[in-house]
Amino acid sequence: MPRLKDKYQNDVIPAMMEKFGYKNKMQVPKLEKIVINIGLGEALQNPKAVDAAVADLMAITGQRPVLTKAKKSVAGFRVRQGATIGVKVTLRGDRMYEFMDKFVNIVLPRVRDFRGLSPKSFDGRGNYSVGLREQLIFPEIDYDKIDKVRGMEVTFVTTAKTDEEARELLQLMGMPFSR
C-alpha cells in the first residue's frame, strides 16, 4: 500500500472527522484523481513536439498520455479542428498516491525559490491546480535528453464540497501551502 494512502486512512480521516464534525468516515473528502496536462502551442509548427511531450509525461507518470485535440478551429491562433494541441494523463488509485508523494517530497523542493503553494488556486469546488514552469524538476527527466523546456498543469481533484475542506485535506496529506 502506498505510504500516502496509509497516512490518509490512519491520520487524515480522523483529523478531518474531528475538525469538520463528520459522523461517518465515508463523508470525509478524498483525493479522486490527479490530472497532468501539457499544452502544446508549438505542436502546430513542430509536430515532433508532441512525441517529446508524450515521452516526458510517460517518464514522469509511468502511464501513456492521451493526446488532446482542438474542439474548434480558431483562426487567430491558426488552430484547425482536430489538431493535437496537448497531452494529458489522469492518475487514479495507487499511482495517484505514489505521484502525489513524489510531487510533495521530491519535486516541489526542487522548484527554484519555492516559498509554498498559493492557497488561492482552488476552483470553488474543492479542486486544486498548480502550474509548473519546467519539466526538469522531475527526477525522471534527463536534462540532456529534452528538446525544450515545457510547463505543465497539475490538478488535484478531490471529493470535497468546499475549498476549505479541500485545502485541509491536501494540507494534511503534506501539500506545502504558503501562509
Swiss-Prot record:
Keyword field: Ribonucleoprotein, Ribosomal protein, RNA-binding, rRNA-binding, tRNA-binding
The UniProt record lists the keyword rRNA-binding: yes
Taxonomic source organism: Carboxydothermus hydrogenoformans (strain ATCC BAA-161 / DSM 6008 / Z-2901)
GO cellular component, one term: ribosome
GO terms under biological process: translation
InterPro entries to which the protein is assigned, alphabetical: Ribosomal_uL5 (IPR002132), Ribosomal_uL5_bac-type (IPR020930), Ribosomal_uL5_C (IPR031309), Ribosomal_uL5_CS (IPR020929), Ribosomal_uL5_dom_sf (IPR022803), Ribosomal_uL5_N (IPR031310)
Protein name: Large ribosomal subunit protein uL5
Superkingdom assignment: Bacteria
Coiled-coil residue windows: none
Entries under Pfam families matching the protein: Ribosomal_L5, Ribosomal_L5_C
Function: This is one of the proteins that bind and probably mediate the attachment of the 5S RNA into the large ribosomal subunit, where it forms part of the central protuberance. In the 70S ribosome it contacts protein S13 of the 30S subunit (bridge B1b), connecting the 2 subunits; this bridge is implicated in subunit movement. Contacts the P site tRNA; the 5S rRNA and some of its associated proteins might help stabilize positioning of ribosome-bound tRNAs.
Keyword Membrane: no
Subunit annotation: Part of the 50S ribosomal subunit; part of the 5S rRNA/L5/L18/L25 subcomplex. Contacts the 5S rRNA and the P site tRNA. Forms a bridge to the 30S subunit in the 70S ribosome.
SUPFAM superfamilies referenced in this protein's UniProt entry, alphabetically: RL5-like (SSF55282)
Any one Gene Ontology molecular-function term assigned to this protein's record: rRNA binding
Family, similarity comment: Belongs to the universal ribosomal protein uL5 family.
